Amino acid sequence: MNSRVFNFGAGPAMLPEEILKEAQEEFLNWRNTGMSILEIGHRTPEIISLLSTAEQSLRELLNIPKNYHVLFLGGAARAQFAMIPMNLLRPGDDAAYFITGIWSKMAYHEANLLKKAYYLSSEEKEGFVSIPDYQKWELKSNTAYVYYTPNETINGVRFPYVPKTEGVPLVADMTSCLLSEPINIRQYGLIFAGAQKNIANAGLTVVIIHEELLQNQPEPVIPTMLNYKNHADHRSLYATPPVFNCYLASKMFEWIKKQGGIEELFQRNCLKAAKLYQYLDSTDFYLTPVSKEARSIMNVCFSLYYPDLEQKFLDMANERGLKALKGHRFTGGLRASLYNAMPMAGVDALIEFMSEFAKENG
């Protein structure tokens, strides 16, 4: 197959074709340096300028106040499951967690392994198909932060609200939703996101952290590479950053601006998800486990009424250029991820195929 396909993968995800073409054109000789972006030293003026431009673009998109630091860190977002408690919990502190899916469950267990954590609510017994009703939760007096995952990539559930924390810093794993919908940064103490959904290619984690959370040095002492303050003090240059990822992220930030900004993309994302859910709700051939009020806009999880047809569905979808629809290995089933770069044409093509498949196999 020579043409581009529709990649519904949860990550690495689809990137805008125009960005890929720009990167291709610049690959051998970036900004007339005679070198590829992959070859340029990270402390050169060119790369320092690139990081500064990327940070400023992200600040403009999200209206990030000056008292928040933006960090571009190498590695998987999953590393934050350990870095957050190691940096934010001091002796005698507790952390509170909402367990609403696989990723928040993993984060909770990692925090408990290293420090002390408790959960405010767990939806595991119900199968991670809903979000706890909004209420005033009782926080322990020694709670240093409250952690939640606004969008659970694996389970396809989304918080329809921002939890109230009574002044306790709110920490959010926004790996699969950052830049897909408007947020108020001031409601959070720390936000992190892996890049491979809506930001860039895999290997970069963006952290946005309030300066007050950097004031107290961790106790006991932690490795220097895991200390947020070290990265903030060195403007993401404490060690070699993932330069190519930051380069793509900078292009992605500018692409979002050209599309009309985050609000415009949010409207598109809502329309894409609504169209797919509307089709799923119209047929008994496909099943959607998540309660309607908790459905993700980014990750639409579903299954077949006849599960033995799943592999046939995936094989035929692949032949139609509809890729990566297999659900996560922890949950099974099917999943269509509708990140910013997925056009409505991709959703239309998927619905057309699903309708034909249901008629032929129902």
UniProtKB/Swiss-Prot annotation:
The keyword Amino-acid biosynthesis applies. One of its GO terms (cellular component) is cytoplasm. Pathway: Amino-acid biosynthesis; L-serine biosynthesis; L-serine from 3-phospho-D-glycerate: step 2/3; Cofactor biosynthesis; pyridoxine 5'-phosphate biosynthesis; pyridoxine 5'-phosphate from D-erythrose 4-phosphate: step 3/5. SUPFAM superfamilies: PLP-dependent transferases (SSF53383). Pyridoxal 5'-phosphate binds at A77, R78, W103, T153, D173, Q196. One of its GO terms (molecular function) is pyridoxal phosphate binding. Its main location: cytoplasm. The modification N6-(pyridoxal phosphate)lysine is found at K197. InterPro entries: Aminotrans_V_dom (IPR000192), Aminotrans_V_PyrdxlP_BS (IPR020578), Pser_aminoTfrase (IPR022278), PyrdxlP-dep_Trfase (IPR015424), PyrdxlP-dep_Trfase_major (IPR015421), PyrdxlP-dep_Trfase_small (IPR015422). Keywords: Amino-acid biosynthesis, Aminotransferase, Cytoplasm, Pyridoxal phosphate, Pyridoxine biosynthesis, Serine biosynthesis, Transferase. Its cofactor is pyridoxal 5'-phosphate. L-glutamate binds at R43. It is an enzyme of class 2 (transferase). Coiled coil: none annotated. It is found in: Cytoplasm. GO terms for biological process: L-serine biosynthetic process; pyridoxine biosynthetic process. Its EC number is 2.6.1.52. It catalyses: O-phospho-L-serine + 2-oxoglutarate = 3-phosphooxypyruvate + L-glutamate; 4-(phosphooxy)-L-threonine + 2-oxoglutarate = (R)-3-hydroxy-2-oxo-4-phosphooxybutanoate + L-glutamate. It comes from the Bacteria. Binds 1 pyridoxal phosphate per subunit. Signal peptide: none annotated. Homodimer. Catalyzes the reversible conversion of 3-phosphohydroxypyruvate to phosphoserine and of 3-hydroxy-2-oxo-4-phosphonooxybutanoate to phosphohydroxythreonine. PANTHER family: PHOSPHOSERINE AMINOTRANSFERASE. This is Phosphoserine aminotransferase. The gene is serC.
